[in-house]
């Protein structure tokens, strides 16, 4: 959205095991799914491709993204928070963003690794929050946040290591 690009592709498996990684495709700033994705599959299967020239541009979107988040959030005091990156993409930008927001992040499993060596990347399953719970308690942190592979799903742990489920966060 920030670049107003005509389309995009993200490699993700979200909270699924690595063998389910695939492409999340967008066109005109909308996700491609259902009939549209089936039409794309048919084009690929038919090998009826248009040819032409194009170009590749590289743009840093992380800095503008962090600036935007910092402009809309105001955290009045430093909070010690343990973050479990789930070995997904959160580790690329998350800890840096939290520091810019004035938080004190303690990182676990923030090294991106698509084989997810530390635990399955679904933070809505209690079994996958064990490391986060232990670290929150060991560090006397105020909060723990676990992320899935593409950082669009979270699991929350309070300062005592208790899981706060989605309906409790409301």
Label for each model-derived stretch:
Residues 121-170:
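Acidic, glycine-rich loop-and-beta core segments that form the ion-binding/anion-interacting portion
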Residues 6-9, 24, 80, 105-106, ...:
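Structural motif
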């Amino acid at each position: 959205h920030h670049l107003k690009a005509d389309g995009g592709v993200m490699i993700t498996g979200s909270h699924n095991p690595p063998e389910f990684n695939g492409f999340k495709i967008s066109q005109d700033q909308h996700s491609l799914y259902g009939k549209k994705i089936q039409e794309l599959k048919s084009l690929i299967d038919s090998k009826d491709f248009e040819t032409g020239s194009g170009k590749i541009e590289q743009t840093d979107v992380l800095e503008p993204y962090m600036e935007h988040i910092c402009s809309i959030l105001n955290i009045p005091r430093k909070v010690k928070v343990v973050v479990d990156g789930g070995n997904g993409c959160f580790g690329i930008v998350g800890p840096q963003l939290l520091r810019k927001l004035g938080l004190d992040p303690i990182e676990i499993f923030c090294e991106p690794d698509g084989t997810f060596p530390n635990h399955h990347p679904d933070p809505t399953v209690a079994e996958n929050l064990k490391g986060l719970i232990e670290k929150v308690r060991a560090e006397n942190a105020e909060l723990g946040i676990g992320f899935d592979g593409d950082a669009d799903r979270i699991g929350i742990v309070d300062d005592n290591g208790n899981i706060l489920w989605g309906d409790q966060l409301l």
